[in-house]
From Swiss-Prot:
Pfam families, alphabetized: HIPIP
UniProt lineage: Bacteria, Pseudomonadati, Pseudomonadota, Gammaproteobacteria, Chromatiales
Function of the protein: Specific class of high-redox-potential 4Fe-4S ferredoxins. Functions in anaerobic electron transport in most purple and in some other photosynthetic bacteria and in at least one genus (Paracoccus) of halophilic, denitrifying bacteria.
Secretion signal span: 1-37
Disulfide bonds: none
Name of protein: High-potential iron-sulfur protein
Record-linked InterPro entries: High_potential_FeS_prot (IPR000170), HIPIP_sf (IPR036369), TAT_signal (IPR006311)
Species name: Allochromatium vinosum (strain ATCC 17899 / DSM 180 / NBRC 103801 / NCIMB 10441 / D) (Chromatium vinosum)
């Protein structure tokens, strides 16, 4: 134990407050170890008219693939990454987000699905 008496001075209180305030941004940067995938600004939104018409979902496992399956692959294997309409060289494309001929100027998730899915040739 310390022989130093507990000091409740204003200076000590300010030090504690500043230390706490400095730690908050660091906690947000660390994110408590959780991965957060964020969609790019030009990603197809869920309320996009074309997305609604084509039943597009960024997560193919949550889409209506079984009911609206297209020929070429079993429904559980159909996703944007193996679709003919996906454009890997679109502006702003990443490993997870690519362009699509059906959504000009916007990006789709490679793990997504829509009712126009068509097996990529070759």
């Amino acid at each position: 134990m310390s022989d130093k008496p507990i000091s409740k001075s204003r200076r000590d209180a300010v030090k504690v407050m500043l230390g706490t305030a400095a730690a908050i941004p660091m906690i947000n940067l660390v994110g408590f170890g959780t991965a957060r995938a964020s969609a790019p600004a030009n990603a197809v939104a869920a309320d996009d008219a074309t997305a609604i018409a084509l039943k597009y979902n960024q997560d193919a496992t949550k889409s209506e693939r079984v009911a609206a399956a297209r020929p070429g692959l079993p429904p559980e294997e159909q996703h944007c990454a193996n679709c003919q309409f996906m454009q890997a060289d679109a502006a702003g494309a990443t490993d997870e987000w690519k362009g699509c001929q059906l959504f000009p100027g916007k990006l789709i998730n490679v793990n997504g699905w829509c009712a126009s899915w068509t097996l990529k040739a070759g």
